[in-house]
Design a protein with these regions (language model features):
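Hydrophobic membrane-spanning alpha-helices of multi-pass integral membrane proteins
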Residues: 208-220
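Helix-coil boundary and N-terminal low-complexity module in membrane systems
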Residues: 1-211, 225-229, 234-235, 241-301
Length: 301
């Protein structure tokens, strides 16, 4: 099943992600309007820097709380359905309910999924930092700083979807413990890193272009609206970041997630795991070591 086909067939998840993102956005806009109203009442500028700071902090807190709980479980259900679509070639009609049931069956409790996702994401961030350490070697070479910076950005985006791939792998290995399957999933990704990074090059360029377009178009529209309401362009710039983040979360991230998972699932079944890679990754990442320890705990139990 092609990436575009899976994307279209799982659009219900995309719309749910958009609804979630827009709910946060609308809440943020209401907060902005309240702060602007208070500023006008006290005779200050429409929205001064103090008001913008308060608004930005409150918006960030709301965004983090919603995405860390509701967003995580929605993503998990989406990943579960996509993993079946890639490996088995079908998408259930009641995909949302089926996805939730798969997550509940696989992880039992929400907490188990959150722990696994945090460990995988943390391991990815730590492994990404090794690129920065290598890049410091070339810091004195003229022009190399830009190359290293792009390389770090590229690696960051390319590895940013590993957690979805590893979570998807856990749904394909139902006979194994969730942490064991997740740990194996990370190892499989890095064992095939050269092949997968080649595919990720196109993905990275797509993410950069689409994210910029989402922000730029949103920014133009909101600047025009805020100027008409005399709210100033600074507020429009902040709002455009939130709105474009919601659009990216729903449309861009969903497509890239499916594309990355498909590339991963094509190589995962035929990969014979190199066991010394566990030890190497444990030395590079404390988070991966914690994940590996939990996997060993499952095997003992």
């Amino acid at each position: 099943m092609k990436t575009s086909t899976i994307y279209v067939k799982t659009l219900k998840f995309v719309w749910l992600r958009l609804a979630l993102g827009m709910a946060v956005t609308v809440t943020s806009i209401i907060l902005f309007a309240i702060i602007a109203g208070i500023s006008n009442l006290v005779g200050a500028e429409p929205v001064n820097m103090a008001g913008l700071t308060i608004w930005f902090i409150l918006s960030a807190i709301i965004y983090g709380l919603v995405m860390n709980y509701v967003g995580y479980m929605l993503k998990a259900a989406h990943v579960a359905v996509v993993s079946k679509a890639v490996t088995l070639g079908y998408v259930p009609d009641n995909m949302v309910e089926e996805g939730k049931a798969m997550v509940t069956k696989r992880f039992g409790a929400t907490n188990a999924y959150l722990i696994l996702d945090k460990l995988v994401s943390g391991a990815v961030r730590e492994l990404q930092k090794t690129v920065g350490k290598v890049g410091n070697i070339f810091s004195g070479v003229p022009g190399m700083s830009n190359v290293v910076e792009f390389l770090q950005t590229f690696i960051g985006i390319a590895l940013g979807y590993i957690d979805e791939c590893c979570l998807g792998y856990t749904f394909c290995k139902e006979g194994e413990g969730a942490f064991k399957a997740g740990c194996d999933g990370v190892v499989i990704y890095f064992q095939n890193i050269k092949k997968l990074l080649k595919s990720a090059l196109v993905t990275t360029v797509m993410v950069m272009i689409l994210t910029f377009l989402a922000w730029f178009i949103t920014c133009l529209l909101l600047v025009a609206a805020c100027n008409a309401l005399e709210w100033g362009w600074i507020g429009a710039a902040f709002l455009s970041v939130i709105v474009s983040a919601a659009l990216k979360y729903a449309f861009i991230d969903s497509f890239i997630m499916i594309r990355t998972m498909k590339a991963y699932m094509e190589v995962a079944p035929g990969t014979v795991i190199t066991f010394d890679l566990y030890d190497k990754l444990c030395k590079l990442s404390a988070k991966f070591r914690s994940l590996f320890d939990k996997a060993k705990g499952e095997m003992v139990a």
